[in-house]
Regions:
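Short, positively charged and aromatic/hydrophobic N-terminal segments
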Residues: 10-11
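Metallo-beta-lactamase
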Residues: 14-29, 117-125
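Conserved beta-strand hairpin/beta-sheet module of binuclear metal-dependent hydrolase folds
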Residues: 18-76
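Active-site HxH/HxHxD metal-binding segment of metal-dependent hydrolases
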Residues: 43, 64-67, 74-125
Length: 125
């Protein structure tokens, strides 16, 4: 387990040099907070990983935060084929802007969103 506020270093070479090292907090019971470091700032928004036999990511953060979230998931041992579900609570860009990038990085994951938001995720225009 990771102690709260531990900073986890970059997991692999797949993340470019501009991606900040993920900040991961162990919330207990296999739940982790991942600071998305929105716009390069810590403490604004977070994603949550619920580990288990079918890991679930709640919220993706912005598209610019997606590499940080992917790096954090890798540091937590979640590979491209491990993530089962991505849940977005609503489709504001700070919560769901990274869905496309996360879905690409984790092609096996099912994206779950309210039916009213689904069409906007597919076509935000």
């Amino acid at each position: 387990m990771l102690p709260t506020t531990d900073r986890v270093s970059r997991h692999n070479g797949d993340v470019d040099d501009h991606t900040p090292a993920p900040i991961i907090s162990d919330l207990g019971d296999d739940v982790y907070s991942i600071d998305t470091q929105m716009a390069g700032h810590a403490g604004i928004t977070a994603s949550y990983l619920i580990r288990g036999s079918r890991p679930c990511l709640v919220e993706t953060g912005t598209a610019l935060s997606a590499p940080t979230v992917v790096s954090a998931l890798a540091a937590l041992g979640v590979s491209a084929n491990d993530l089962a579900t991505v849940v977005v609570t609503h489709i504001h860009l700070d919560h769901a802007g990274g869905v496309g990038d996360i879905a690409t990085a984790f092609p096996q994951a099912q994206v779950v969103v309210h039916e009213r938001g689904a069409r906007h995720l597919a076509n935000p225009t």
